[in-house]
Amino acid sequence: MQKPCKENEGKPKCSVPKREEKRPYGEFERQQTEGNFRQRLLQSLEEFKEDIDYRHFKDEEMTREGDEMERCLEEIRGLRKKFRALHSNHRHSRDRPYPI
């Protein structure tokens, strides 16, 4: 058995930690949603500014970009055709009915 210290004689034996102030229920969640709301608001504001910048293009610039996009798509279609042709030629060359 432990002997009580002279320093601890006047104090209660078990020290109970003090409780923090009681917060209203849901305050933490409310603060978190406010923070998330602010972040989403700032992000949407930045996206809106970017959209506004794109809306100020002239019609000529938009049609030029559209033409460039169409040209790129045509190039992709042509490359796909070439790959299909090469693949089918390679496959047919292996399917010979007689050995070489």
From Swiss-Prot:
One of its GO terms (cellular component) is nucleoplasm. It comes from Homo sapiens. Its main location: nucleus. Residues 1-34 are annotated as: Disordered. Highly expressed in normal and fetal brain tissues, and weakly expressed in uterus and ovary. Down-regulated in epithelial ovarian, cervical, prostate, breast, brain and lung cancer cell lines and in brain and ovarian tumors. InterPro entries: TF_A-like/BEX (IPR021156). Plays a role in the negative regulation of NF-kappa-B signaling at the basal level by modulating transcriptional activity of NF-kappa-B on its target gene promoters. Associates with cyclin D1 promoter containing Myc E-box sequence and transcriptionally represses cyclin D1 expression. Regulates telomerase reverse transcriptase expression and telomerase activity in both ALT (alternative lengthening of telomeres)and telomerase-positive cell lines. Keywords: Coiled coil, Nucleus, Repressor, Transcription, Transcription regulation. The gene is TCEAL7. Residues 60-88 form a coiled coil. It is found in: Nucleus. One of its GO terms (biological process) is negative regulation of DNA-templated transcription. Belongs to the TFS-II family. TFA subfamily. Residues 1-32 have a biased composition (Basic and acidic residues). This is Transcription elongation factor A protein-like 7.
